[in-house]
C-alpha cells in the first residue's frame, strides 16, 4: 500500500553535476535511466522495473530541473506522467497508427514536409530536451527524412524553387536544440527567399 506522505526530494541530487547555467550542460546531465528517476522521486522499485521494460523503444530523457517540479511519491503527478515510460506503451492497440498526423505521405525529402498549400515544415533536428510519452513523432524516421544540418541547403533550395511556399515552420524535435550559429545561418538563408513571408 502506498503511503500518502512521501519523504522530501533530495534537491542536491537533482542539480546538474557541473554547476553551470548552460542549457547544453543541463541536457547532458538529464536523467535517462528510469531507476534514477524513480529513486529521485521516492517511487517504488516495482515502478522502476516496469518503466525500464517500457523504455526500450522510446528512451526516457528528462532534465533535472523538470524533475524538481514533480511531487515526490506521487505516481499521478502530471509532470511525471508526461515522461515516465509505462508498460501500456507496449500494448498492441486496435487501429493504432505510427503516423497519426499523416506526415509520411507529405514528406518531400531533405527534411521537408508539406501537407498544405503555401506552407511547409522543415525538420531541423530529431531531438528534444524532454522525451514526452505522448509525442506524435516518436516513431518518425528522422534518419530517412534528412532532418539534419547537412540537409539544410537542399531543403532551402527546394523552398526557393517553389514560389507557392510563403510560410516555413521550423520543427523537429525542438529546433532550439540546434547550435545557434547553424540556426542563424538557416534563418538567414530562408530570409533571402522573396516569397517566404513567415517563419
Describe each region flagged by the PLM:
Residues 127-131:
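Short pre-active-site segment immediately N-terminal to redox-active cysteine/selenocysteine motifs
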